[in-house]
Amino acid sequence: MIQRIQSLYLLLAAGAGAASLSFDLWKAKLSNGTQTAVNASSNYLLFVLYVIIILLALGGIFLFKKRKLQFRLTIFNILFAFAALGYQYYVVQQTANKLVAGGVAISSASYQFASFLPILLIVLLFLAARGIYKDEKLIKSLDRLR
């Protein structure tokens, strides 16, 4: 199960998804001296997207005997990771726009570590899908030799 490289990639992807839930995506220092932050846990849809990503990655690890289903779930998970990436940047922009519309000036703002984790997620899931595909090709070639 964990002996296969794609299982390791899926486990790392689940860890990256969990880290995305733990850390802030964006922090801003406001002109009135306070700070505000956006994290995935505070937005319901973003939280659900990351939970789905984590569950699909962990579920994919245990589907090692059903490689075609594992491959499809991993591709589907990549789509969820793209959706999470796009939606988290939308949430950050909406938060910044609400602050500015509310008359609060942002003196400095920066994306945090967790905002780049969906990119790592996509890469890890792609590597896992590639490993699953190679496994499937290897099994088919061995079946032809029998």
Outline where the language-model segments fall.
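Cytosolic juxtamembrane helix at the C-terminal end of the final transmembrane segment
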Residues: F126-R146
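Individual transmembrane alpha-helices with interfacial aromatic-anchor signatures
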Residues: Q6, N43, A105-L127
